[in-house]
Each structure stands twice: as structure tokens, then as C-alpha cells.
């Protein structure tokens, strides 16, 4: 990455296929990486990040993302399995997933059976999302967003599986269209 805050960080893009990410996706991913491994303020600056790209509404997947059995290589279930195969110890998913597919359930179960921790965002829909996001499955650590005073952010979702919180703002992140913080 070219973000100055990540200079010297151990980050490897392990995406199994071509994903063209929007500026918003790049900014979000870089901000999450910086919160983890930035040398000045990351919570685990010596950690190694294996990065896997999901496809969001403004992103596009390459033709090499077609997978087997109808599961594309850039889908959450496939990426979780790839991370397991790559030796991940903690899987942090800073997005929500309302699909709730059987392959996703089994990928999460496989991670849990191998002692791999999965933490996932509760979502940004400002409602109870107990039945529709990653944390609906036992063992996934659901994370809601709070402000610097410990109050849930107005936009953040919550639910039965939410057992943790992380500061969701105000946080300065790099704007990749301008390069500014």
C-alpha cells in the first residue's frame, strides 16, 4: 500500500481473483488496516495482515473470480476458506453480510473448528440485525460501532450476536481521491 501510515507494515494481498475496488472501498480497507497495524497508532503494529477483497456495489469482479459449485472466489464463504488455508489466526470482516448462505455457515464452522477467531461488523443500517448478519452464527464476534464516549453510533446496527464494540468515529481516514487525511 502507498498509505504513509502503513509504511513498513506487513500486509499481503491474498485475493484469489481480480477485484477492481472503488475509491470508497480502498479508503475503507486502508483505514481498517491502519487501525490494526499502523506504526503510530495501530492496535497490533507487528501483526501480519492477509488481505482479501470482497466486491461491493461500486466494485467489479474479474472473469477469474468464477468459482466452483456456483460459489465465486470473491464471495465471503470462499474468502474465509482461503484465509483458513493461508494460515489466518484471526479473520476480521469489516462489512456485514445479509446473504446467510449454507456455504458461509460451513466456512464459519470450519474456522471455529480450527480455533480461528472471526470478528464481523454488525452493519450500518441502524437497526436490530440479529437474524441477517455474520454474528447470527454462534462463535462469530459481532462488533457494533461506538463513538469516542462509548455510545453506539446512530448508524450502527445491533443484535443478539453483538458482543463487542469498536470506535466508528469520528476517525480520520485517508481519502484516496485527494490523498488527504
Predicted regions mapped to residue ranges:
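Short hydrophobic/aromatic-enriched beta-strand-loop microsegments
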Residues: 12-16, 141-144
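Short pre-catalytic strand/loop immediately N-terminal to key active-site residues, enriched for Gly-Thr
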Residues: 17-24, 177-181
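Substrate-binding/access-modulating region of protease and related hydrolase catalytic domains
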Residues: 58-135
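Extracellular S/T/G-rich loop segment that most often corresponds to the catalytic His/Ser-adjacent loop
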Residues: 132-181
